[in-house]
Amino acid sequence: MDLATAAQVSEAVAEKMLQYRRDKSGWKICREGNGVSVSWRPSVEFPGNLYKGEGIVNGTPEQVWDCVKPLAGTLRAQWDENVNSFEIIESLTDTLLFSRTTTPSAVMKLISPRDFVDLILVRTYEDGTISSNAANVEHPSCPPNPAYVRGFNHPCGCFCEPLPGEPNKTSLVTFFQTDLSGYLPQSVVDSFFPRSMAGFYANLEKAVKKFFG
């Protein structure tokens, strides 16, 4: 995929992410607690669900972003229990890249290790919000690996948003829309994402404190 095509595809993904962020309709809350809310609605991208997580994280937007950013130097693999490794396959620009992420087994090994190959665009907005915008792609240097089930991320990512009057807090809104592939009971998938997203926020809070506290 050349730069022009990648830019066009990634901009379309980023626009979808903005639509998800702005559209308040159709969301059903499936998990709440510790200041974090997880909701879902049916995906229009694949026969599954789009999940939204919302929570306030103690830390500046820059600190939170350093922990979650899908860029070189990210701290993500050091704290996120759902990420074994994150590697940049190819950087097209400072904010546009191809990545490969591997995840461990989960739900008492009912979900075996996965890998995901994505095109990622980072956007910065005038109000200081930083967003990551990702979707699955194929890349010649990353054919399927027999050690992993290849999963597919449909438009997903996060928004790190400053809180007016609260410089040391960040509103983090996340969107997950993942086809885990393999032969998984839908009940396993439906229970996994809300629980793992709630855990993501709890672990992120600890990570910001550990790395920047």
Curated annotation (Swiss-Prot):
GO terms for molecular function: cholesterol binding; cholesterol transfer activity. SUPFAM superfamilies: Bet v1-like. GO terms for biological process: cholesterol import. Residues 1-213 form the START domain. It comes from the Eukaryota. It holds the Pfam family START. Keywords: Lipid transport, Lipid-binding, Transport. May be involved in the intracellular transport of sterols or other lipids. May bind cholesterol or other sterols. PANTHER family: PROTEIN CBG07384, STAR-RELATED LIPID TRANSFER PROTEIN 5. This is StAR-related lipid transfer protein 5. It comes from Bos taurus.
